Amino acid sequence: MIRKVLAEELKNLDVYLPDLGCTVGEELLRPTRIYVKPLLHVIGEFGKDIKGISHITGGGFYENVPRMLPNGVRARIEVKKIPEKPIFNLLAQKGSIPVRDMYNTFNMGVGLVIAVSANRKSAVAGALRAQGETPIVLGQCERGEKGVDLVW
């Protein structure tokens, strides 16, 4: 999808865009964050409280989050808690991509989702902060058909 938007709408990747703080090309070439060290730290400290981990890649939230859930559990993610990234707004606008398709294709700036016991979420978030991460509580898991609901 991104190739189509680039080929048809964003042909000049050297254009500086103030919203991005860099050129489109520089933003698209920004390296993927690697979460191994902070994740290993958190697993070592809170292993029994971690119920699932999902690397949000191609397939976005709708395909990746359910993979970490057992049958009978549904994730509810509050989209308003996800900080907006200008590059995704640009891609959606230039490519006329519907919002649901954006969340089904891209990670929207959320590279990793961790499901933890509700009573340990603050402790796990604190441990991630101590590792230099910026965790956000995006929602919760509840009983239901295995899957994910994005709530606006």
Model segments located where?
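Buried, small/hydrophobic-residue-enriched core segments of structured protein domains
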Residues: M1-E8
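Glycine-/charge-enriched secondary-structure boundary and capping motifs
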Residues: E8, N12-L29, R33-W152
